[in-house]
Amino acid sequence: MTRATVCVVGSGAREHAIAWSLARSADVVVTPGNPGIGGVAPSGHTIRSDPKPPQLLDASLYVIGPEVPLVEGLADELRAGGRLVFGPGAAGARLEGSKAFMKQLCAGAGVPTAAWACFAEPSPAIEFMKSLAPPYVVKTDGLAAGKGVLVTSDLAEAAADVAAKLSGSAFGGAGRRVVIEEAMAGPELSLFAVCDGTRALPLPEAQDFKRLGDGDTGPNTGGMGAYSPVPSAGDAAVSEAMGRIVEPALDALSRSGADYRGLLYAGVMLTPDGPKLVEFNVRFGDPETEVVLPRVTGDLVELLAAAAGGDLRPAAAEAACTPDAAVCVVAAAPGYPEAPRSGTPISGVRAAGTLPGVTVFHAGTRRLDDGTLVTAGGRVLCVSALGSTITAARARAYEAIARVGFEGMTYRRDIAEAAAKSEVT
């Protein structure tokens, strides 16, 4: 696909990272994009943002970043117009759009996951929780931007959360049904698989940090940082998770008539009984993308185009990755995740990006008419760094984020800390 143009749909740090990676071998247009997306890549290919909808942009390949347009059927619409699309249609996107659907599909496919039940009324949900040992896991059935999960050992808190979700006061229609799960124990793994409808090819694994505060304290967020690879997992765990979780689910989707051509992201718990599924997402994870894609050394355009075309095999070698590690740290606005403050001037982004191996991906930013860069969302920037080890990558990421500043900026100081310590013990 020489001098191809790829259209990326989305506006966050994930889409910035996807565009940055694709621009090694193609011109990239991102819709609607953000102020950080633009310019000329080292390869000579251009990257630009464009507010026009993807249906009005001419491209050789379309890559859909966020889950909402996938669930709403954007991939189907583009394919109906003869476009080559990396992203599942609405039938496959139900895997993330409804946790109850996901659980039912997994049960039929024999995918190991936590015991569960789905409820639309508080009383039976609370009675079910009483039958479980704490901690209790309460999830919205629908999309909640990664914030619809409560894990607590307090039954009263869990019951109040169920009531808030089912009433619609917490997450609107997304919470009109809740999934209650048995808690699982073990380290978590984010596993990305590029799928062509029948085959799946893993990308480098990652681990993310969902809680706002150090030591996994505070509320759940969309993700405050990540690292890759995950030494506690290893190739054997990834291979087992692919065989027990990803491949059976993809086969079940195929048998149901869903031609799943896109990214299947499995959140996996490495339990004493082997890997078990926490949940599926139908797109690249954020912030994991910001550490996974910098490690991919192959031609991402060729890889995603092959999957979109229905046959990964000719491009399988393009999933190759560097042995180097990557660590990213998210800078969040004050008030995140409940009520983030916007409009605060940001400094130091360019200085951070001049450090070796560092890339600053924009998430929630906006540029004023006078050129000032300001905050425009909860997660504002994602600072990603490559290094020969997790320790080295982590040091670079934290050196870089220390150069960035805006009033009330918050970030975790312990991203990849345990993994870095494990390298020297």
State each model region's role.
Residues M1-A91:
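ATP-binding N-terminal substructure of ATP-dependent carboxylate-amine bond-forming enzymes
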Residues M1-T2, A23, G39, L56, ...:
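Solvent-exposed alpha-helices and their adjacent loops that cap or buttress functional pockets
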Residues C7-V8, E96-V179, P231-P248:
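Active-site nucleotide/adenylate-binding loops and adjacent lid/helix of ATP-dependent enzymes
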Residues T152-E288:
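Internal nucleotide-binding/catalytic subdomain
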Residues E157-A160, E338-P340, S388-A395:
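Short, conserved charged micro-motifs
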Residues M242-L264, N281-L355, L368:
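Active-site "cap" helix and flanking loop/linker of ATP-utilizing ligase/carboxylase catalytic domains
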Residues T365-D370, V374-T425:
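Generic C-terminus detector
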